[in-house]
Amino acid sequence: MVCDGFTYGENALRLVRLFQLLAALTLPGGLFVCDSAAQTAPPADAFQVLRQVPAGPRITPYLQYQLDQAWRQDEARQRDWEAIQSEQDLLKMQASVRQALLQMIGGLPGRKTKLNPRTTGKIQMDGYSIEKLIFESLPGVFVTALVYVPDDHSQKHPAVLVPAGHATNGKIHYQALCQRLAARGYVVIAWDPVGQGERSQFWDAKADKSRYNLVCAEHAVLGNLAYLAGANLARWEIWDGMRAVDYLLTRPEVDGERINITGTSGGGTQAALIAALDPRIKVAVPSCYISSLPMRMGNRIFVDPDSDPEQDLFRMSSNGVGHPGLLLLMYPRPVMVASAVLDFFPIEGARKSFREAQRLYERFGNANRIAMTEGYHPHQYSDENQEAALDFLDRFNGMPRRRGLAEPKLLPDKDLVCTRSGQVMVDQSDSRSLAEVIREYYQERKSQPAIRLSKEYYEHRAMRVENSKLEKFNGVPPGEDQILWELISSSSTGDVQIDKYVLHHSRLLEMPLLFIHNISNETQKTVLWFDETGKATRLDWPELEKFLQSGYNVVTFDFRGLGETRMPYTAVSPDDPSLGKLDFDRAYANSISGVLANYVYNSLLTGRPYFFQMLEDSQIASRFATEKLGAKSIAVTAPGDAYTLASAIAEIFPEIKLLTQPNATALKWSEIVERKQETWPIQYLVPGGAHIH
């Protein structure tokens, strides 16, 4: 029997609370009485503050807030570029951007170790051969690769690195491009990125598959660990590429003065990053990657929601790098941007970034060294773009001019694997997982002075809550230094009154807030309460009632992007549709492709991690409770995973006391890295968090 207003939540915590509520409303004789329920628990709509919006994709106020931040940062970068007056100014800017990029990825390994290359097989093709290669980019980190070598050994050949995009079979997926390059006389190396192809890090040998998909999911798990350690997954992807260059330089067939790179999608990301940081790259052609960060932040939830941390470098926007900065780091070397008009990397962003870099190339006499090609098609390295790219490579490598593309002879995947089992970590007993490497990276640095959480919170703030004006809302949106409160309505059940408020702040944001208090026993003690999904609902009434009976008023509120401010939309991964079949709560917060994960990564790009924005929201709620609701003392608590946030609130704001929860523990970022923990609530992702105490 279900009374009107009960909501059956599919996630476990909500289900537990439903049973708690049922227990509270069940008489000793086992009879369930709906009239009694009405007296005990307020109706569901008493907990709803905002007008519900139709389900579906939308630019929410929080997403718009993130985009506004990114555009302001992009405009600041453009002003810096416009101030460049000489080539010396440009090179100085280039050095600054390079240093920022190195800092964002956590630096590069300090020394190069032995590659220990070995060939595991060879296939003879028409005019070239394909060698199956395994080398070590770091001790115990085995890289599986294919090397395409022209049969003509009478002269040295230019070489091309082809980093793989997000394909399950990694390097093999790009064999057509590699064959075409080899047919033109290039030595080509294509390798599996970590987490793809033969380099799964979470392979279940019995099930003969990874615990995650081999497109982006392993990158998400590893990348989130890397963030906590103070680095980025891109650090190790770039290093694999640099070591691939080292390998090419050991080949007698290779002309070391003519090393080039091209790749598409995730391979385009790697091509841009490797070329930016390795001056040995002569020519670069990144495909289907270069765009504009604000535009990319605005569309990826809807068209490409999969988490890919190596593309979301911490402070990439706020540090003035962005995609144009990666092109700047190529100057004055030749670079071509290959784009798809119908790509989910917005074409207008690609055109914008290209033109900004082009102006600098032109201003200092290098106009012929930068180019762009566009194909009218979706996300792919099309034949027309490949032809333009190969012509560009030929021109700057002194190769004969050719027309058209060679017809590739595609080989089955099984013929192109480098290992016996198909997975290098299965074959190599001495292999190290990247999670181990990330842990080692952290351990080498954990002796450094600890970082205080409060210091991190108070730096890089978009809003100074303590100095903002707290005023009544009069219909005019707030300025950046205002918090405007609006009383929506009040209702009562027995002696309990629930006041619904909206706090307008940060120009665009709204915070739904409930003030729950006992009319007959007014108190000045207040507890802030929330769970991992936001403010309280009717299912949480047994928990709230305990605080009311203990003499507390309750203030419960939604953090930006959670609760009633969630986007009513399930992001569907094109690479793993099963993620879209999760119930709404779990799909929304899924760390591999959920809406919340995309909000979190957007926040990293703009320099203020979502976790700190949640803390900012709690400071706003606390100040409102003190100055408007008359709270003389404030405590905070939360059940389950949300206790981590409650603990952080009490640590940063000493005026707020933490009320402990039975069996509740706060996550420790350092322990997550030490344990190589694969998942945790994505909203608690803090770059460098393992070093925070």
What are these regions (language model features)?
Residues 243-318, 621-685:
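Primarily recognizes the serine-hydrolase "nucleophile elbow" in alpha/beta-hydrolase
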Residues 1-16:
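N-terminal secretory signal peptides that target proteins for export/translocation
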Residues 155-242, 247-250, 293-305, 522-624, ...:
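Cap/lid segment of the alpha/beta-hydrolase catalytic domain
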Residues 19-30:
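Bacterial N-terminal signal peptides
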Residues 39-142, 331-512, 516-527, 532-553, ...:
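Alpha/beta-hydrolase-fold serine-hydrolase catalytic core, especially in secreted/extracellular enzymes
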Residues 25, 35-36:
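Cleavable N-terminal signal peptides
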Residues 148-150, 163, 191, 262-264, ...:
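Generic beta-strand/beta-sheet core signal
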